[in-house]
Amino acid sequence: MISTKKTILSSILCFSIILSVLSNFSPKLLYAEQIDTDSLIMENSNNLQTKNNQYSNNNYNDVKFNIAVAADWGCTEDTKKTAANIQSKNPEIVIAAGDLSYEESADCWIDIISPFKSKLMISMGDHEYQDTEGGASGIMNTYLNPLELPKTYYSFDFNNVHFVAIDPYVDYGHNSDQYQFIEDDLKNATSDSRIDWIFVMEHIPMYTSPTEHPADSTIRDIYHPLFDKYGVDIVFSGDNHNYQRTFPLKYNNDNGNSSNPIISDNNQNDYKENTGVIYLTSGTAGKSHYEIEEQAPFVAKQDDKHFGFLNIDINDKTVKGTFYANERELGYYYVDYKNNIIDHFTISKMNAANNEFEKL
């Protein structure tokens, strides 16, 4: 856990250099506060528009949009293919869940994602701390001061979804400012009648099959109970350069060991509401692949051979997730990125009007 003033300052500096070059972003995005997405998105892009009347009784049930999620990007030819794959699905929000350029400069990555940079939301990865240019003083004068000391954890609403970004590289313990912000924010989202879904983005995986990086038990023990308490639906992560989707999970601290969560629904693809949190690792944006040694019992689907991204289709009561790989590979039932499906799942919530579950 990182809690020193020096490290917090470093985290802010690194995140600021990435976000500052995204010219269509408002500095408000960087503050640890809930963003007024209605105004923010209208400021930044004609492609990302949220109108207050979408929350009205007349229009709320018609909400339908999609988001794209990927982590561990780099500046490779495969990164370019992933960007094209994402662009082909025309998402309204793109979540880059950490580890962006892997270079001293963000320029190469910014160039690759330029077709949808106005739609981008970012969570912090370890390479945003390790790889930057200019030194602390240069970044301070150029980026930090004009942005008035922004923080790197935040939340925002888009239509009927509440998004929360956690920064695992600044203090996130129970007594930290970040934890207090996250808890208050989730509590408010849960009590908001306009919100059907809560998605969290956080780079370090809390659960994983055996692969390059083990699961982080510290952040898991702090935040999974909080996610259970406030009904978080999905957690997006990266760090491991492969794709993994868990079953819906409940926190289980069995004799001080939380590595064996409770599988609350063992269906492979279709889930009902409030059965548990689904943890998704999508470190597949293009940097490299990490081999998965075996499949953990709490993992429903995994893949370590393909680059691509996770697409989430959302209406008022249904989430449909689809992992699209970038291209055909010999021996696999996959085609090109126009309709290449590696994994799919659906979460359906009760329709109070007719007591039935809806599906896309």
PLM regions and their residue ranges:
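Bacterial N-terminal signal peptides that target proteins for export
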Residues: I2-I12
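Hydrophobic core
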Residues: L13-V21
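Sec-dependent signal peptide cleavage junction
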Residues: V21-S39
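N-terminal active-site segment of His-dependent metallophosphoesterases
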Residues: E33-C108, S209
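A short C-terminal boundary segment appended to hydrolase-like catalytic domains
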Residues: E33-Q34, M42-N44, Q49, H289-L360
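Residue-level marker for buried hydrophobic side chains located in beta-strands
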Residues: I67-V69, V94-A96, I122-S123, V200, ...
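Active-site glycine-centered loops adjacent to acidic/histidine catalytic or metal-binding residues
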Residues: D72, G98-D99, G125-D126, H203, ...
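Extended active-site neighborhood of metal-dependent phosphoesterases/phosphodiesterases
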Residues: Q87, S105-R194, I198, H213-Y223, ...
